[in-house]
Amino acid sequence: DDVELLDGAAAEFDLEKVRHGKLSPVFFGSALTNFGVEPFLEGFLRMTTPPLARMAGEAIIDSFDDDFSAFVFKIQANMNKAHRDRIAFMRVVSGRFDADREVYHVQGGKKLRLSRPQQLMAAEREIIEEAYAGDIIGVFDPGIFSIGDTLCAPGKKFQFDPIPTF
C-alpha cells in the first residue's frame, strides 16, 4: 500500500530527464532484508546507457570511432589501505584502450602513459591488457585527475561535455 502512495504522488518518470541530469531517481530498499533489491537492479539496468555517442562541444564522439577516448567519472582514495592508493575510474567512450598506451590528458595538457589498468569488482582487482567502448577501468591517479576529465588519443584535443550534477 505504501508503494502505491509513492507511485501516485510522484511525477511521471522520464528516462531522458535522468540521462540529461534533470531528474534523479530514488530507490527504497534494504539489502539486509532483501527488500527493494530486485527493483533497484532492474531499474539500474534499464537506466544505464549502452556505449553511446558523447558530446564534446559541437563535435559528437561516436562509440564506434577508432580513436581512443574516455572520461573520468569517479576518484576513490585508500581502496587498498596498505598502499594508500588513489584510483581514477573512467569509462571508455570510443576506440580501444591498451595497457601502457600513451594518451593525452586534455585538462592537464600533456601526454601520459597509463600502466596497470584494472577492472574492479568489490574488493577484487584484475590487471587488464585492453578495454573497449563502454568498459569501465581504473588507473592509478597520482593526483592529476579530476572528475569530468577527458583522455584521448595523442593528436586529438577535445573535451567532453561536463557530467550532469544534481
Predicted stretch roles:
Residues D1-F166:
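Structural and coupling elements of P-loop NTPases
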